[in-house]
């Protein structure tokens, strides 16, 4: 997503879930054939170098979570916070998973991997 009206539509009609590392706005759409994602980091976070680093961290966290857990169709906006750039990356991914789980409810499936990164049977 790149256009302001798209972001405003998600903000107005979607659900908003805040975590320590980010804010996620979610507008699920079962009829859509694609998933659209937008990233926002305001000037409160810092100068352009810091904002771009924050945006890159959000983009990579989403890429990894989507690859591991899948992502349903709809529109998503990830809003970076001050803590996004300093937060441990594994915690940032957990924040994103938590926000998606809370915002999507039963539509979002949990990862079959345990905390160690191994399958459920091997995590013991």
Curated annotation (Swiss-Prot):
GO MF annotation list: 3'-tRNA processing endoribonuclease activity; ribonuclease P activity; tRNA binding
EC primary class: hydrolase
Keyword entries, A-Z: Endonuclease, Hydrolase, Nuclease, RNA-binding, tRNA processing
Enzymatic reactions: Endonucleolytic cleavage of RNA, removing 5'-extranucleotides from tRNA precursor
The family this protein is said to belong to: Belongs to the RnpA family.
Subunit text: Consists of a catalytic RNA component (M1 or rnpB) and a protein subunit.
Task of the protein: RNaseP catalyzes the removal of the 5'-leader sequence from pre-tRNA to produce the mature 5'-terminus. It can also cleave other RNA substrates such as 4.5S RNA. The protein component plays an auxiliary but essential role in vivo by binding to the 5'-leader sequence and broadening the substrate specificity of the ribozyme.
Name this protein carries in UniProt: Ribonuclease P protein component
Annotated organism of origin: Gluconobacter oxydans (strain 621H) (Gluconobacter suboxydans)
Gene encoding the protein: rnpA
């Amino acid at each position: 997503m790149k256009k302001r009206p798209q972001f405003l539509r998600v903000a107005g009609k979607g659900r908003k879930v805040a975590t320590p590392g980010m804010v996620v706005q979610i507008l699920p759409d079962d009829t859509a054939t694609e998933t659209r994602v937008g990233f926002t980091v305001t000037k409160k976070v810092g100068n352009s170098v810091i904002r771009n680093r924050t945006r890159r961290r959000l983009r990579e966290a989403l890429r990894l979570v989507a690859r591991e857990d899948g992502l349903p169709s709809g529109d998503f906006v990830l809003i970076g916070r001050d803590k996004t750039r300093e937060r441990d990356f594994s915690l940032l991914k957990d924040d994103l998973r938590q926000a998606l789980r809370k915002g999507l409810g039963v539509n979002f499936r949990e990862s079959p991997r345990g905390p160690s990164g191994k399958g459920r049977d091997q995590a013991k």
